[in-house]
Amino acid sequence: RPVLTAACAVVFVVCAVSLIRYFVDIGRARSASDELRRTYAASQTLPEETAVPAPAETAVETAVPEPVSTPEALPTQTQQTAETAADFASQWAAGYANNPQLRISESFQKLRQQNRDVVGWLSIAEVLDEPVLQRDNSFYLTHDASGQKNATGALFLDESCNLRLPTPHLVIHGHNMKEGAMFGSLKKYKLKDAAFYKEHAFITFNTLYEEAQYVIYAVADVSIDAKDADYLPFWAYGTFTDQAQWDAYVGKIRELSRYRTQVDVQPGDRLLTLATCSGADNSRRLLVAARQIRKGESSLT
C-alpha cells in the first residue's frame, strides 16, 4: 500500500506540473500577442466618415445555413472554362492595385521592429484578434509571437504563400488550444449552430501590403490522410491551373461543409483558409474557408 500511495503521488505531481506548464505557456503566448496587439492598435487611425455602400447580395448569406450530418454533392457552378492555364491564371490580379510599389504599411513597420516575422493581422469580431507570422511551417508550432520557445505556438502563414504577389489562396495555421487560445476559438463554428456562423461570417486579414475582408463560405472537418474519403490536401492548392482543379477544391470543401451558405465563389476570388487540428486524431483538420470581399461589396449587413 505505501508503494501504491507513492506511485499515485508521483503521478499527481507529474500531472500537476504538466498542467501548470500548459497554463504558463498559454499565459506567455497571450502576453506576446498582447504586446504586439498594443503596438498594432496604437498605429491604427480611424478613417473619415464616408457613405457606406449597400452590401452586394453575394457578400452575405441570404438564408440561414442548415447544419448537415452527411456530405452531399452541390450543383456544379456554370463557369466559362479557360482554354489555357495562363488564361485561367489571368483571372487573378497580378499585383495590388492600391499598392503596386509594395510599400509596407506603418502599422506593420512598427510590428516588425518587435518581430521581423510578422506578416499580417487576423481578426474575427468576438472570436479572435491575433498577429500572423511566417517562417517555415514548423517554427511557430513551438514558438510564440515574440519568437520565444512555447508549446502554445502562434498563428502562422503557410510557408508556400508569397505575400509579394496577390496569392490566390492563403492558408493560416494555428493550434487548437482547449481554452480558446490561438485557433481554439474556431471550434465554435463546429460546435455551435448556424446562427453563430451568420453572426461571425466575416474575417479581416490585413497584411504588409493590403487591408482586406473575407466572407466565410464553408466550415469543414477534413482528413489529411490520403486513405480517407474526406481527404483534402488544402495546403497544396496555393494556385489553380484550370477550371477542373478549381472546381475540385471548392466543390470538395463545400461538400464537406457543416453549413450550406449562399456565398458564391468564382475563379478570380482570393481565398483564405484557417486551419487547425480537430479532435484527438492528428489526421483531422477543422477548416474555416473564406473568399475575399469583392470591389463594391460590403461586409456590413
What are these model-predicted stretches?
Residues 12-301:
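Solvent-exposed, non-transmembrane regions of membrane-associated and secreted proteins
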